[in-house]
Amino acid sequence: MSDAALIIEEDTPLVEERIERIYGTVYAMSSPNAVHQHIFIKLAHQLDSFFDGKPCTPYAAPFDLYPLANAGDTETVVQPDIFVVCDKERLKIDGYYGPPPLVIEILSQNRSHDLVTKLNLYHQAGVEEYVVIDPLDKIVMVLTYGEGAYRYNAYSFSDKIPSHRFEGLFFDLSFPLPF
C-alpha cells in the first residue's frame, strides 16, 4: 500500500507555493521565465563541472538557505538560484545553515528583492561573494565582501567573468539566449 494521500484536485494548487522569509516578512516567489531558466541551467552545469572533485559543492533552487543561522536566526530563509557549500557541517537534509561563500541570483520580475532586500541580508550574513545576473540589460554584478562592505565589479555577458572567491572559476554567459 502506498503512503501517498488522496488529493482532491480543486483543493490543491498545481504548483507548490514557494516563499522566502526575511526578518519576519514573507515574500511569495513567482516561477522563473524561460530566459532565467536557460541561464540557470547553464550556470549550474558550469559550477557543477568546476567543483567536481573539490571540497565545495553547488546547490540550486529550490533549496533552503538560512544565512543568519550563525547569529541564531533560523526563521530567515531564502532560496537563492545557486549557492556554493564548503562547510559540510552546516549542510542538513532540509537546508544550509549559515552564510555560504558564494550566492548567485538571476534577476526576474522582482528585481528590487534581489538587488536590495537580499543584498542587505547577504551583507549582514557575511556572504563573501554575491553574483547578480541581469538578463534584461545583459550585465553581471559581482559583489565581493571585504572590510565590512561589498566591493562592486560590473561585467557584460561577453566578458570573461572571474569569481573573486574561487580562483580559476569564471562565469561564462556568452551563450545565446532563447529570446
Kindly give the residue locations of the regions a language model identified.
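Gly/Pro/Ser/Thr-rich low-complexity, intrinsically disordered segments predominantly at protein N-termini
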Residues: 1-179
